[in-house]
C-alpha cells in the first residue's frame, strides 16, 4: 500500500517552480511504491523495537553493520514451508487472482483505483489502465499464485491485494537468480484497522518460498528495518500552464507566465541522429547494451532477452505505447545500436476540477549507452553525461509530443548527474529500497548525507521499480 511522504521542509524555487503544497508534493505522494499503509507514514519516527512485525522478519536492524554479505536466514528447505495459507479473520478468505481474466483484472483495477493512492487533500488519484496492470503483473515466468487477494466471504468482494513477480538481480558480485519484486500492496480504506498488511506480506512470502524464492526487493517511502539504499524523486514540468491552471504550480516570486512557459519550452523535434522507436529485432542488441551498462552499478536488475521484450516492447512489434515507450539510436553506417531509453505512463485523476480531469505523468525507466565510460577519467565521464542528457532530453521532447504534463524520475542509474541540467526539480519525496532476507553494505542512491541530490558521483542503483 502506498503511503504519504515524510516531507522535507526545504524548497528551492531556483531549481523548480513546484512549491510546497503544490504539484511537487502531490506527485511525490503518487510516485511511491511501498509495503506500508498510509496512516503509518504520518506517524513519528520509530525505533527498531517499534516495528513489531518487521522484528519477526529476516531483515537487517538499523544499526547492523554488514560483516558478511548474504542471506540472513540461510534456510531454504521447501519442506519446512507451510502448505496452508495463513489464517484470516472469519469474514475473509484468500483468493488467487487470475489477471488473464478480464473480470478479475477489473476487480484489481477497481480496488487500486479507489484505494491504492490518494493525496491527503483527495485531489489526485492514480488512474490505472488494465494494460498497465497486465504489463506490471505478467512478465516472463510470472507465477499466478503470487497475485494474492483477500475477499469478503459473504459478498466475494475483493478488499485487499498484493503481488510479486520474478526477476534476477546482482548485488555487487553476487547474483540472486531467483528473486521476487513485491508491489501493489493495497487494502480497502475501511479495513485498514484489521491488520491485514502483515498477513498479506507473510502470505506472499510463503508462496514465494514454495517456488524456492527466498529473497525479494521492495520499496517504501518511509523508513523500515532496514534500507539498502535511499533515493529522491525529481520532476520536470512539460505542460506548466496546465499545472498552473489546476492550481498546483503557482508563479515563483518575480516570475511571469511567459517566463515560466519559456523556461520549460522544448523543441518540436528530437535531436539525436539515428533515433527511432525500438523494434522487435532490436531486443538482442538492447539486452546486450543494457547488460553492459548494468555492470556499472552495485545493485542491478539482470534482464534476459524475454524480459527486455516484455518490459520495453510489451505486446508491440514496434514501440508505440500506451503503457511504455522505448527508443534506440542506430548508427546509420554500421547499423549498430548505440543507445536506448524508455519511459512509461501512469496518469492521475484530478478530483473536483471543472476544467481538467487528469494529469498525464511519464516516468523515466531504463536507458543505456555504449558511451558509458570504461575508465574513471573526467573526460570519459563528462562525455557520457552529455550523451545521457541528449537522449533523455529527447525522451522529454517525445513525452511532450505525446501530451504528457510532467516527467518524473528517481535518482537511480546516473540520473542524479544530469537531470538538473534538464530542468528537473528536486522533489520532497524519497524512496527507500529493501532486500528481504539479505544483508549487504549500504548502496548510494544518488543523494548525499543531507538528502540533496549528489551531482558528484553516480548512484550505485541499477534498479527501477514501477
Swiss-Prot record:
Tetradecanoyl-CoA binds at residues 51-54, 185-187, 193-197. One of its GO terms (biological process) is long-chain fatty acid metabolic process. It is an enzyme of class 2 (transferase). Residues 8-19 have a biased composition (Polar residues). Keywords: Acyltransferase, Cytoplasm, Phosphoprotein, Transferase. The keyword Cell membrane does not apply. It comes from the Eukaryota. InterPro entries: Acyl_CoA_acyltransferase (IPR016181), NMT (IPR000903), NMT_C (IPR022677), NMT_CS (IPR022678), NMT_N (IPR022676). GO terms for cellular component: cytosol. PROSITE patterns: NMT_1, NMT_2. The active site is at 466 (proton acceptor). GO terms for molecular function: glycylpeptide N-tetradecanoyltransferase activity. The modification Phosphoserine is found at residue 17. Its EC number is 2.3.1.97. It holds the Pfam family NMT_C. It is found in: Cytoplasm. It catalyses: N-terminal glycyl-[protein] + tetradecanoyl-CoA = N-tetradecanoylglycyl-[protein] + CoA + H(+). Monomer. Adds a myristoyl group to the N-terminal glycine residue of certain cellular proteins. Belongs to the NMT family. This is Glycylpeptide N-tetradecanoyltransferase. It comes from Schizosaccharomyces pombe (strain 972 / ATCC 24843) (Fission yeast).
Amino acid at each position: 500500500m502506498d503511503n504519504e511522504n515524510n516531507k522535507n521542509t526545504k524548497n528551492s524555487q531556483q531549481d523548480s517552480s513546484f512549491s510546497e503544497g503544490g504539484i511537487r508534493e502531490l506527485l511525490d505522494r503518487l510516485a511511491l511504491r511501498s509495503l506500508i499503509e498510509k496512516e503509518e507514514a504520518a506517524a513519528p519516527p520509530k525505533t527498531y523495537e517499534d516495528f513489531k512485525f518487521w522484528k519477526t522478519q529476516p531483515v537487517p536492524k538499523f544499526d547492523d553493520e554488514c560483516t558478511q554479505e548474504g542471506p540472513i536466514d540461510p534456510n531454504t528447505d521447501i519442506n519446512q514451508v507451510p502448505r496452508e495459507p495463513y489464517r484470516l479473520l472469519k469474514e475473509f478468505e484468500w483468493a488467487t487472482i487470475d489477471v488473464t481474466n478480464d473480470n478479475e483484472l477489473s476487480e484489481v483495477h477497481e480496488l487500486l483505483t479507489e484505494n491504492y493512492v490518494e493525496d491527503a487533500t483527495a485531489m489526485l488519484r492514480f488512474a490505472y489502465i488494465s494494460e498497465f496492470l497486465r504489463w506490471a503483473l505478467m512478465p516472463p515466468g510470472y507465477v499466478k499464485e503470487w497475485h494474492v487477494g483477500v475477499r469478503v466471504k459473504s459478498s466475494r468482494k475483493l478488499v485487499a491485494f498484493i503481488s510479486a513477480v520474478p526477476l534476477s538481480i546482482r548485488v555487487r558480485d553476487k547474483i540472486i537468480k531467483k528473486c521476487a519484486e513485491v508491489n501493489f500492496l493495497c487494502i480497502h480504506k475501511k479495513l485498514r484497522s484489521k491488520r491485514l498488511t502483515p498477513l498479506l506480506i507473510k502470505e506472499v512470502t510463503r508462496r514465494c518460498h514454495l517456488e524456492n524464492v527466498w529473497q525479494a526487493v521492495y520499496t517504501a517511502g518511509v523508513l523500515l528495518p532496514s534500507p539498502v539504499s535511499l533515493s529522491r524523486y525529481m520532476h520536470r514540468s512539460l505542460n506548466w500552464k496546465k499545472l498552473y491552471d489546476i492550481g498546483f504550480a503557482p508563479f515563483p516570486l518575480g516570475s511571469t507566465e511567459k517566463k515560466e512557459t519559456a523556461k520549460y519550452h522544448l523543441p518540436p523535434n528530437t535531436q539525436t541522429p539515428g533515433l527511432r522507436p525500438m523494434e522487435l529485432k532490436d531486443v538482442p542488441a538492447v539486452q546486450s547494451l543494457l547488460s553492459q551498462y548494468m555492470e556499472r552499478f552495485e545493485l542491478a536488475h539482470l534482464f534476459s532477452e524475454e524480459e527486455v521484450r516484455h518490459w520495453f516492447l510489451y505486446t508491440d512489434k514496434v514501440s508505440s505505447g500506451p503503457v511504455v515507450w522505448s527508443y534506440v539510436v542506430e548508427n546509420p553506417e554500421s547499423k549498430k545500436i548505440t543507445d536506448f531509453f524508455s519511459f512509461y505512463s501512469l496518469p492521475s485523476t484530478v478530483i473536483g476540477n471543472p476544467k481538467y480531469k487528469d494529469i498525464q505523468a511519464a516516468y523515466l525507466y531504463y536507458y543505456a549507452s555504449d558511451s558509458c565510460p570504461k575508465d574513471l577519467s573526467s573526460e570519459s565521464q563528462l562525455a557520457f553525461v552529455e550523451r545521457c542528457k541528449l537522449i533523455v532530453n529527447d525522451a522529454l521532447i517525445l513525452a511532450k509530443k505525446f501530451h504528457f504534463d510532467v516527467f518524473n524520475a528517481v535518482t537511480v542509474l546516473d540520473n542524479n548527474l544530469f537531470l538538473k541540467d534538464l530542468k528537473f526539480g528536486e522533489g520532497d519525496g524519497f524512496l527507500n529500497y529493501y532486500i528481504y532476507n539479505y544483508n549487504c553494505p549500504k548502496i548510494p542512491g544518488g543523494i548525499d548525507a543531507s538528502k540533496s541530490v549528489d551531482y558528484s558521483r553516480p548512484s550505485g542503483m541499477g534498479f527501477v521499480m514501477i
